[in-house]
């Protein structure tokens, strides 16, 4: 068979000649890649913005699209800015630092609109706060390269780790902790025994959890504990055979005037100020009264349940992790709320009997990225007046909302929640009303 001429080399075993070419960027993907076309084929270009002409290197070829990396911007967009972080080009933590913040929000809003195009929604509202130094939690990898101890995040589209000097989206306190930890790692001989570290800031202070791949000596552990005390952080060790660390220290944060305790390895929203705004908006949209019985699904340690309990007649929180349910019960007790009940249940399975006995009037759910599709058949049988859906994955929210609409609900309000500025992550809140 003759080879075709005038076309890009065909893919073979994922290996092909890498080539560089000029492209005119027409759009932007949900993960912040520029969209161009070459001979009718779509090209996704890392680091390119709409309206730009760039010189890009095609690094991956597929049947439906190719992937490329910007090498030089020939005609620059007026929306382009110099990234504040020196590691932006390599680090996979942020995707949008080269785009002015208002246009970041606009891009996410347009993407949400595309995801919800079948739902007949109105305008998408915006809930936002400051765009830097917001992240109160982070997980970083530790490794040794060329005899140098390094720490950082995964590189873009790679399993490689980028060694970073600091991270500007961390809270200012955690930025200081990060710098101190990096210096300590350079002085330590334990780097080869450390898999990763987790940084956390809450109302009790800053903490570091070190995940060990191999055991360390009592002397080394003692030296690290002395260092942690001098730096002013709480230090936890997680051995390779431990799934959960033990801690006598109380970790907590405030929301809606309530004290929420949690285990340092359990889920909490990483953006504290946006979490406060999100809960306030949820209470305003759902507007529970003493006449309401509210069901809070995937309730965690009570982030929504407890504010709901301050307003509703009765609240029932359901969570899959027993450890988080225990904290939720403790939080209800510590905040003197006796009209809220928590149960542990797998929400991918038939509803527990206690749910079937309740005449639920309103529902709030905040599921993982996979959504809540398995529970929706049960949910619509409750016939709640309103359903407030908080989502970290717009595609599964759109899927679940389609089911709810087909079963008697209409979309009342939708909001983009800017939990992760400088990144391509878009969180959403949707209120559905029963017809």
From Swiss-Prot:
Keywords: 4Fe-4S, Iron, Iron-sulfur, Metal-binding, Methyltransferase, rRNA processing, S-adenosyl-L-methionine, Transferase. [4Fe-4S] cluster binds at residues 85, 91, 94, 167. S-adenosyl-L-methionine binds at residues 269, 298, 303, 319, 346, 366. Gene3D superfamilies: 2.40.50.1070, Nucleic acid-binding proteins (2.40.50.140), Vaccinia Virus protein VP39 (3.40.50.150). It catalyses: uridine(1939) in 23S rRNA + S-adenosyl-L-methionine = 5-methyluridine(1939) in 23S rRNA + S-adenosyl-L-homocysteine + H(+). It holds the Pfam family TRAM. This is 23S rRNA (uracil(1939)-C(5))-methyltransferase RlmD. It comes from Marinomonas mediterranea (strain ATCC 700492 / JCM 21426 / NBRC 103028 / MMB-1).
């Amino acid at each position: 068979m003759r080879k075709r001429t005038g076309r890009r080399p065909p893919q073979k075993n994922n290996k092909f000649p890498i080539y560089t070419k000029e492209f005119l960027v027409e759009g932007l993907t949900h993960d912040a890649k520029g969209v161009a076309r070459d001979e009718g084929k779509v090209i996704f270009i890392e680091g390119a913005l709409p309206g730009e002409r760039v010189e890009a290197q095609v690094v991956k070829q597929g049947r439906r699209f190719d992937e490329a990396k910007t090498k030089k911007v020939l005609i620059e967009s007026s929306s382009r800015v110099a990234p504040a972080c020196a590691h932006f080009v390599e680090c996979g933590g942020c995707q949008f630092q080269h785009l002015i913040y208002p246009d970041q929000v606009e891009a996410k809003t347009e993407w949400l609109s595309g995801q919800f195009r079948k739902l007949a929604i109105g305008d998408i509202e915006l809930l936002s706060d400051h765009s830097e130094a917001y992240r109160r939690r982070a997980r970083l990898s530790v490794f040794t390269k060329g005899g140098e101890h390094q720490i950082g995040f995964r590189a873009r589209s790679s399993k490689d780790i980028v060694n970073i000097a600091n991270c500007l989206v961390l809270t200012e306190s955690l930025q200081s902790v990060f710098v101190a930890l990096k210096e300590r790692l350079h002085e330590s001989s334990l780097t080869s025994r450390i898999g990763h570290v987790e940084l956390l800031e809450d109302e009790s202070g800053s903490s570091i959890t070190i995940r060990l791949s191999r055991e360390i000596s009592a002397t080394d552990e003692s030296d690290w504990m002395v260092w942690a005390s001098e730096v002013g952080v709480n230090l936890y060790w997680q051995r390779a055979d431990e799934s959960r660390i033990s801690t006598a220290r109380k970790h907590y944060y405030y929301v809606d005037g309530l004290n929420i305790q949690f285990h340092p390895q359990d889920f909490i929203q990483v953006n504290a100020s946006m979490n406060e705004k999100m809960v306030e908006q949820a209470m305003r949209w759902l507007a529970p009264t003493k006449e309401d019985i509210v069901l809070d699904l995937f309730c965690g340690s009570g982030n929504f349940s407890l504010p709901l309990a301050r307003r509703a007649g009765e609240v029932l929180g359901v969570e899959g992790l027993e450890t988080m349910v225990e904290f939720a019960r403790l939080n209800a007790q510590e905040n003197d709320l006796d009209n809220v009940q928590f149960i542990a249940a797998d929400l991918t399975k038939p509803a527990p009997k206690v749910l079937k006995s309740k005449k639920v009037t309103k529902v709030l759910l905040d599921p993982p990225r996979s959504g809540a599709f398995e529970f929706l058949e049960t949910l619509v049988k409750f016939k709640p007046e309103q359903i407030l859906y908080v989502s970290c994955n717009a595609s599964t929210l759109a899927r679940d909302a389609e089911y709810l609409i087909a079963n008697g609900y209409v979309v009342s309000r939708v909001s983009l929640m800017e939990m992760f500025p400088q990144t391509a992550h878009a969180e959403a809140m949707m209120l559905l009303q029963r017809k």
